[in-house]
């Protein structure tokens, strides 16, 4: 067997939203000691025969993280700095507390705790407690490629409304759009935030009880989160995560009760049909 790098692009655009991935192929040695594909071709296979070697179980990355442990899971990523610099699972039992830092466009210190997107059919959910006091305080759920390309469903303090609100910020190759026409005033109590990714289409929903969700904002093009579309990317692949910003004092915190990442193409296609999105 041989392990190799690959990508699974959207076609016909050839946009690799999942970035660089790892695959395995069954090989054979020829009589003159060359390594060849087992079937004699030179094309990578989507499905490969299993090896007869003994199994070596590897711990699976959990779909659901309730943050009950003493340490943050090693499957999380953060731009440029270690997650422990701003994410604390000991401050409040059963939660991760994110300390807000600079704007998400910053190339210095930002508070984004993320996981790699491993399928373009996924559902990401979190439960957040956050009470913004000024406009520069915000926290929420993010679909992130780099500091110039992301979609952020955020709770923040709206000076126009005079209270907390939910709205979506979209950066596309550095061009910022805030969808104020879909802004929603919300109460300062626990709130569920959810992101659906269904192939080329991605959208956000929110709920107070975790049962009855409301869609917010428009549907976004998943394929644009790729090196082939983004001008500033480094082929890291798209990330999904939670985030907090305090552009004043870098002290304001948001508490997240859990982070759930479910990637299942069959289930998500059914959900898409049930909700009537076409």
Each model region followed by its residue ranges:
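Carbohydrate-active catalytic/glycan-binding domains of CAZyme proteins
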Residues: 1-278
